[in-house]
UniProtKB/Swiss-Prot annotation:
Quaternary data: Homodimer. Heterotetramer of two MnmE and two MnmG subunits.
Residues forming coiled coils: none
GO CC, any one term: cytosol
Binding site for GTP: 231-236, 250-256, 275-278
Cofactor (UniProt): K(+)
Protein name, UniProt field: tRNA modification GTPase MnmE
Annotated (6S)-5-formyl-5,6,7,8-tetrahydrofolate binding sites: R20, E85, R124, K459
Main localization (coarse): cytoplasm
InterPro entries tied to this protein: G_TrmE, GTP-bd, GTP-bd_TrmE_N, GTPase_MnmE, MnmE_dom2, MnmE_helical, P-loop_NTPase, Small_GTP-bd
First-level EC class: hydrolase
HAMAP family for this protein: GTPase_MnmE
Length: 459
């Protein structure tokens, strides 16, 4: 492989920016541009050390930057190749000059995710662990981070590898029974034993799939839409959950004329929170566009926060909102309880049915804890708090687990219906192969390229 380089820190002004190199020539290229105290060369220093010096243009001998350089020698590195990380002062100009120097001296600009891709190709991590790296970067809550970290450390991989080993052992027994039935010392694989082994695998796959709904929520967030008539407190609710002013809060109906989106961490549950324009009939063209967008995001939401005004009677528009959200997960929020009551709460609870109704005074910051509790209990039963964080959150993994379940189910049905054993072998083999795709065994190169292209440069 050639030697790659990229800036591995976010672009912009900051304390430190890092240019990362990985590959067989990383140390040689670094030696060309690095000038250390008393002529020290990076290729001769100990591995896993950080070294003070300067980056110098070898053509002009001009000092470009004062740096600290980390040297990590193969194979005990993330990519299992030699890695050099040049720690520069933050800023766009100097870090780009350093990058251009190492590229000129023989490195190639890395593609997005190429460092992690090399870790996968060199056997440092499997595909599910590589995908977990991106999940860790994108985690919006502590829970999401813990799930990604467990997957990155190989928890899911170990489980998948164990299942595959059990299937392979079963296949080997079946093969021996078919090819060498005359040997007395070969354990006979009876139908009962086959059913027991296949059922065990199926149950473990199903157990993983039961975590997928919560896992996807932790990974992708709950698409949550705040709806209600204008000036009932939707923007105040958004700001209370986000803890900063994102939307304009005024007494003028129709102030929010567009869709405002923000990620919110509610007790470890990531909400992709959308504040919509008030849904009402209006002659204002700009507001009407916002109302239409509100109706569209409403259709795509996982959770609806329907806000009502405690100080106003239930209107036809409120009732229409209840009708529009029938069959959806909603939490009804009765706001402005600091004002005189005019809302019929019994009627509201009747319209809400089994859905939670929470009373709040966002002005006085009352009722927020109850709302957060309602959100958490609606999506999580408490199992998420346990130490077992082997959650399946990746859509690709979930799809493959469903396919593996179908294959093992077909194998079980075949055994129970006395189909020829070689047909059962086909289904067992298919299950084994599909599970292997989760960790990267027998995955098409185009899929690998597509997965790693989603990473940022320098990772």
């Amino acid at each position: 492989m050639d030697t790659i380089a990229a800036i591995s820190t976010p672009m912009g002004e900051g304390a430190i920016a890092i240019v990362r190199m990985s590959g067989p020539e990383a140390l040689a290229i670094a030696d060309k541009v690095y000038k250390g105290p008393r002529g020290k060369r990076l290729s001769s220093v100990d591995s896993h050390t950080i070294n003070y010096g300067h980056i110098v243009d070898p053509e002009t001998e001009k000092v470009v930057e004062e740096v600290m350089v980390s040297v990590l020698k193969a194979p005990k590195t993330f990519t299992r190749e030699d890695i050099v990380e040049i720690n520069c002062h933050g800023g766009l100009v100097t870090v780009n000059q350093v990058l251009q120097l190492v590229l000129r001296e023989g490195a190639r600009l890395a593609e997005p995710g190429e460092f992690t891709k090399r870790a996968f190709l060199n056997g440092r991590i499997d595909l599910s662990q590589a995908e977990a790296v991106m999940d860790l970067i994108r985690a919006k809550t502590d829970r999401a981070m813990n799930v990604a970290m467990n997957q990155m450390e190989g928890r899911l991989s170990s489980l998948i590898k164990r299942l595959r080993a059990e299937i392979l052992e079963t296949l080997a027994h079946v093969e021996v029974n078919i090819d060498y039935p005359e040997y007395d010392d070969v354990e006979e694989m009876t139908h009962k034993m086959l059913i027991e082994k296949a059922t065990k695998v199926k149950k473990e796959i199903e157990a993983l799939l039961t975590t997928s709904e919560q896992g996807k929520i932790l990974r992708e967030g709950i698409s949550t839409v705040i709806i209600g008539r204008p000036n009932v407190g939707k923007s105040s609710l958004l700001n209370s959950l986000v803890h900063e002013t994102k939307a304009i809060v005024t007494d003028i109906p129709g102030t929010t004329r567009d869709v405002i989106e923000e990620y919110v961490n509610v007790r470890g549950v990531p909400l992709r929170l959308v504040d919509t324009a008030g849904i009402r009939e209006t002659e204002d063209i700009v507001e009407r566009i916002g109302v239409e967008r509100s109706r569209q995001v409403l259709k795509e939401a996982d959770l609806i926060l329907l806000v009502l005004n405690y100080s106003e009677s239930l209107s036809d528009e409120d009732i229409k909102l209840f009708e529009a959200t029938k069959g959806m997960d909603i939490i009804v929020i009765v706001n402005k309880t600091d004002l005189e009551q005019k809302l019929d709460l019994d009627r509201v609870r009747e319209l809400a049915g089994n859905q939670p109704v929470v009373t709040t005074s966002l002005l006085k910051e009352e009722g927020i804890d109850e709302l957060e509790e309602a959100i958490q209990s609606l999506f999580f039963t408490g199992a998420i708090e346990s130490g077992d964080l082997t959650y399946v959150s990746n859509t690709r993994h979930i799809s493959l687990l469903h396919e593996a379940k179908r294959a093992i189910t077909d194998a079980l049905e075949g055994i129970e219906n006395d189909v020829p054993i070689d047909m059962v072998q086909i289904d067992l083999t298919r299950c084994w192969e599909v599970l292997g795709e989760i960790i990267g065994d027998a995955v098409h190169e185009s899929l690998i390229d597509q997965l790693f292209s989603q990473f940022c440069l320098g990772k």
